[in-house]
Amino acid sequence: MSTNRPAHAKKAEIVAEIVSKIQSAQGVAIAEYKHLTVEQMSNLRRQALKQGIEVKIYKDSLVRRAVEELNLTELNEYLTQQNVFVFSNDDAIGAAKLVANFAKENEALKLKAGVYEGAAMDTAAIMEVATLPSKEDLYSMFASSLLYPLRQVMAVINAVADTKQD
């Protein structure tokens, strides 16, 4: 009987870790990796590491306990088969975007669900999130839109200067 307690304590510790990761992550993606090779999984982990994204594999039963604690039970229906959990702490769409892009090249990986801004999302919704531009892209678009009027003014000034020189 005493040998069961350490195993139970270890599982409770893992559940607490999962709860903490989901709470602290801006975005979480859940994907099935059933037929992914070791090389493909290593490649996914390398790509994630470059982007500051964490890739973890947990037993679905432990994730079920964690999502129940977080009132995200809508995710339970996606916790079947072999799942990989991808956590993005810096960019809310980073995890979904990474998995969606990787799945385009590796059909063995299937984006199933996720958590975005603290809400559970089904497959269609998380795929929609994955198509959104990243934070860096949005900053670039914003800066470009701010600079556009300035460029127009500079073009007019240059045109006037050119006509005066002629």
Swiss-Prot record:
InterPro entries: Ribosomal_uL10, Ribosomal_uL10-like_sf, Ribosomal_uL10_bac, Ribosomal_uL10_bac_type. One of its GO terms (molecular function) is large ribosomal subunit rRNA binding. It comes from the Bacteria. Keywords: Ribonucleoprotein, Ribosomal protein, RNA-binding, rRNA-binding. One of its GO terms (cellular component) is ribonucleoprotein complex. SUPFAM superfamilies: Ribosomal protein L10-like. Pfam families: Ribosomal_L10 (PF00466). GO terms for biological process: translation. Coiled coil: none annotated. Belongs to the universal ribosomal protein uL10 family. NCBIfam families: PRK00099.1-1. Forms part of the ribosomal stalk, playing a central role in the interaction of the ribosome with GTP-bound translation factors. Part of the ribosomal stalk of the 50S ribosomal subunit. The N-terminus interacts with L11 and the large rRNA to form the base of the stalk. The C-terminus forms an elongated spine to which L12 dimers bind in a sequential fashion forming a multimeric L10(L12)X complex. This is Large ribosomal subunit protein uL10. It comes from Mesoplasma florum (strain ATCC 33453 / NBRC 100688 / NCTC 11704 / L1). The lineage of its organism: Bacteria, Bacillati, Mycoplasmatota, Mollicutes, Entomoplasmatales.
